[in-house]
C-alpha cells in the first residue's frame, strides 16, 4: 500500500496543476492497480520539493511531530556570521490535519493526514472513484456523450482536495497545523535534522555559515495568508536574535519563500528593517510565476498535436523513464468523443480552482503582478460580492506588497543590507522534472528554471525565450558584461545587477547543484558580496550540473566499503577497491571545480555507480531492450491512430452520432 500511496500522491501533485482530468483519472486508477508504476530508478522525482523524498521521509520519521524541549540561549560558533533563517519553498513545510486535541488526524488505514504540498486521504480514493466516477464513466462510454461524467469529475476533484479547501474569507476550512521549529538545526531531533538536510542540502557547508547553532528553519502553511505568515516571521526573527544574542539575521528565501519576504518587507517598511543583515533569494518567487497566471486564466496549450499526442507521453516518460503508458493512454482516450474529453478537462480545472486556489491567498500570491488585474477581473465576483470582502482585501493587500517590492528592497539596501539573487534560466516549462507544466501556454515564450520565470527570480532581467537570443540591435545598446554568454539574458536591468548569479540550464531543483549550495554559503558568510568577488570560481553566468547522487549517496557508500575492506581485506577484490578509490578521488577533485558543465557530472556519476556495483553496492545496469522496444511499438500505434483521427475520438467520424455541445473553458 505504501508504494501505491506514493504513486497516487505523485499523480495528485501533477493533477493539481495540470488541467487534464482524464489524465488524472487514468493516473489514479493505474496507480492504484499497479503499485510499481513509475518506480523506476530512472525517475527524476528527487531532491528538493520531491514527492518521493517526502514519502520516504514519512516512512522513516516516526517522531516527526515529537515535542522538543525549548533550547537555552547559546552563542553562535562563528561570531562574525549573522544567524541564517531559511524560508523554504512549496512542499518543504509539513502541515497536517489536526483532531480536536491538536494531534495529527489519521485515516481508516491509520496513516497520518499530512503533507508538504497536498494532504490527501488516500484510503478514500478507491471509494470516491467507484462511487462517483464509475457509473457516469460507463454510461458516457455507451452513449458516446457526457452523461454526467464531467459532473462526477468535478465532484471527485473537490472531494480529493477537500482537506485543504479555503472558505470565502480566505481561511482554511479544516483544522490545519504546520510543524514549526522554534530552535536552531542543532536542537532538532535526528529525524527532523535529516528532513531539513533532505529539503535544504546545506550539510557540507553548515560550518561555513556559523554551524548548526546559527541556522534556523522557518516553516509556514501553504493554505494561508502570506501577510499573516510575515507577521509570524517577524516574531521568529526576534526569537532568533534572543537565542543567538545577535542584532541582525540573514534571510534566505527559497522559491515560494520569496512571497513571504515580499509580505514582510511591506508589513514592516516603516521600521527601516533594523533586524535584517542581508537577503539571499534562491530561485525565489519574487514576482509570481506565469505557471500560476496561466492556470488562473485557463491559458493552456491545447494545440491538437501537443495536447492529444505529445503531452501525456512526455509526462509518463518523466515518471518512469518511458513514454509507453502515455502513448497507450492517448489511444485509450479515443474511445470518447472529443467533446467528452473537453468537458471533463473543464470540470477538473473548475474543481481545482474552486477547492484549492480561488479562496487561498497564498495561491494568489504566486500570480505575477502584471497579470493580477486580468485575473481578478476574470473572477470579479470576489471583488463585487460582499461575502468575499475579506478575501478581496487580503489579496489586494498582497498585490500592493508586490507592487512595492522593489522600492522596499531599495530601502532595505540603503540601510546596508545586501540583496543577492541566485537563478536558473534558459528552460521552458517542459524541461526535466514537473514537465506537466508544459501545458501552460507561457511555456512557449518563457525563459525560466522550468518553474519560475527569470524576471521574477532575478528581479528584472530582460530575456529572450528559452533557446533563443536577444536581438543584435538590443545587445548593441547594452553593457556586454551583463549579457549572458548564450545571449538570452541581460542582467543590467535587474534591480541589483551586480548581486545576481545565473546558472544556464539550471532546473528549479537547485539542491542538486553543489556549486549553488557553495555559493549560498559564501554569500551568507560575507566571503562574496558582489559578482566582482571570486569571479573565477563563481562567475555571474555559470552552467549547471547535477551532483546530488554523488554527494548524497556515492561518497557514503564508498566510505562504508573502505571501512569494511580495512577491517577484512578478503571481502573485496583489490582491483575493484583500487578503481573505487580512483573514482572517489576523481570526484573530490571534480567538486572543487565550481565551473558547471552537465555532461561531465553525469559521466562521473555513471563511473562512480559502476565502481560501487563492482563491490556489490547497487544494482546491475538494467536490460532496457524490452522496454525500449515496447515504447517504439506503442509510439508507432499512437502516431498512426493520431494520423487518422487527429484529436477526435473514434466515434467522431460517425456523422450520425449524438453530440452534446459543451462550452470549452479549460
Regions found by a protein language model. Give the residues of each.
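N-terminal non-catalytic accessory region
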Residues: 29-252, 259-312, 428, 438, ...
Amino acid at each position: 500500500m505504501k508504494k501505491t500511496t506514493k504513486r497516487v500522491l505523485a499523480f495528485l501533485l501533477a493533477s493539481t496543476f495540470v488541467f487534464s482530468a482524464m489524465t488524472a483519472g487514468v493516473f489514479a486508477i493505474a496507480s492504484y492497480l499497479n503499485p510499481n508504476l513509475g518506480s523506476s530508478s530512472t525517475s527524476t522525482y528527487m531532491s528538493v520539493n520531491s514527492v518521493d523524498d517526502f514519502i520516504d521521509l514519512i516512512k522513516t520519521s516516526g517522531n516527526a511531530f515529537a515535542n522538543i524541549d525549548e533550547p537555552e540561549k547559546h552563542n553562535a560558533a562563528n561570531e562574525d556570521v549573522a544567524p541564517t533563517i531559511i524560508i523554504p519553498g512549496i512542499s518543504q513545510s509539513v502541515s497536517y490535519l489536526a483532531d480536536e486535541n491538536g494531534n495529527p488526524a489519521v485515516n481508516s488505514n491509520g496513516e497520518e493526514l499530512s503533507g508538504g504540498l497536498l494532504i490527501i486521504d488516500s484510503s478514500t480514493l478507491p471509494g470516491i472513484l467507484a462511487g462517483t466516477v464509475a457509473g457516469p464513466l460507463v454510461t458516457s462510454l455507451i452513449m458516446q456523450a457526457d452523461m454526467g461524467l464531467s459532473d462526477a469529475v468535478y465532484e471527485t476533484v473537490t472531494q480529493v482536495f477537500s482537506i485543504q479547501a479555503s472558505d470565502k474569507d480566505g481561511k482554511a476550512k479544516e483544522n490545519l497545523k504546520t510543524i514549526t521549529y522554534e530552535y536552531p538545526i542543532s536542537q532538532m531531533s535526528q529525524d527532523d535534522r535529516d528532513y531539513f538536510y533532505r529539503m535544504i542540502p546545506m550539510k557540507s557547508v553548515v560550518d561555513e555559515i556559523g554551524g548548526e547553532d546559527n541556522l534556523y528553519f522557518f516553516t509556514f502553511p501553504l493554505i494561508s495568508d502570506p501577510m499573516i505568515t510575515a507577521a509570524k516571521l517577524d516574531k521568529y526573527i526576534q526569537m532568533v536574535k534572543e537565542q543567538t544574542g545577535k542584532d541582525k539575521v540573514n534571510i534566505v528565501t527559497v522559491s515560494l519563500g520569496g512571497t513571504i519576504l515580499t509580505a514582510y518587507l511591506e508589513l514592516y517598511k516603516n521600521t527601516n528593517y533594523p533586524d535584517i543583515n542581508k537577503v539571499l533569494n534562491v530561485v525565489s518567487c519574487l514576482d509570481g510565476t506565469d505557471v500560476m497566471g496561466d492556470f488562473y486564466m485557463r491559458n493552456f496549450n491545447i494545440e491538437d498535436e501537443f495536447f492529444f499526442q505529445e503531452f501525456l507521453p512526455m509526462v509518463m516518460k518523466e515518471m518512469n523513464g518511458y513514454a509507453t503508458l502515455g502513448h497507450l493512454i492517448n489511444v485509450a482516450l479515443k474511445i470518447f468523443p472529443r467533446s467528452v474529453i473537453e468537458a471533463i478537462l473543464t470540470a477538473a480545472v473548475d474543481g481545482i480552482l474552486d477547492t484549492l486556489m480561488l479562496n487561498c491567498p497564498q495561491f494568489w500570491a504566486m500570480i505575477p503582478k502584471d497579470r493580477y488585474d486580468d485575473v481578478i477581473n476574470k473572477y470579479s465576483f470576489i471583488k463585487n460580492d460582499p461575502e468575499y470582502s475579506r478575501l478581496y482585501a487580503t489579496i489586494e493587500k498582497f498585490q500592493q506588497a508586490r507592487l512595492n517590492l522593489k522600492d522596499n528592497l531599495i530601502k532595505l539596501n540603503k540601510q546596508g543590507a545586501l540583496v543577492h539573487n541566485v537563478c536558473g534560466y534558459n528552460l521552458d516549462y517542459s524541461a526535466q522534472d514537473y514537465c506537466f507544466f508544459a501545458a501552460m501556454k507561457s511555456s512557449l515564450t518563457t525563459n525560466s528554471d522550468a518553474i519560475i520565470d527569470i524576471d521574477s527570480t532575478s528581479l528584472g532581467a530582460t530575456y529572450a525565450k528559452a533557446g533563443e537570443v536577444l536581438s543584435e540591435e538590443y545587445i548593441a545598446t547594452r553593457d556586454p558584461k551583463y549579457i549572458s554568454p548564450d545571449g538570452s539574458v541581460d542582467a543590467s536591468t535587474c534591480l541589483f545587477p551586480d548581486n545576481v548569479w545565473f546558472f544556464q540550464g539550471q532546473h528549479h531543483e537547485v539542491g542538486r547543484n553543489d556549486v549553488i549550495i557553495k555559493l549560498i554559503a559564501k554569500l551568507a558568510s560575507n566571503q562574496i558580496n558582489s559578482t566582482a568577488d571570486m569571479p573565477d570560481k563563481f562567475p555571474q553566468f555559470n552552467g549547471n550540473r547535477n551532483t546530488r547522487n554523488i554527494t548524497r549517496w556515492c561518497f557514503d557508500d564508498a566510505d562504508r566499503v573502505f571501512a569494511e575492506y580495512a577491517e577484512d581485506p578478503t571481502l573485496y577484490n583489490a582491483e575493484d577497491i583500487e578503481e573505487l578509490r580512483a573514482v572517489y578521488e576523481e570526484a573530490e577533485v571534480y567538486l572543487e571545480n565550481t565551473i558547471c558543465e552537465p555532461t561531465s557530472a553525469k559521466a562521473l556519476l555513471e563511473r562512480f555507480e559502476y565502481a560501487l556495483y563492482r563491490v556489490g553496492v547497487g544494482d546491475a545496469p538494467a536490460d532496457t531492450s524490452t522496454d525500449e522496444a515496447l515504447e517504439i511499438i506503442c509510439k508507432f500505434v499512437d502516431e498512426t491512430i493520431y494520423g487518422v483521427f487527429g484529436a477526435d475520438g473514434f466515434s467522431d467520424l460517425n456523422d450520425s452520432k449524438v453530440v452534446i455541445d459543451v462550452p470549452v473553458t479549460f
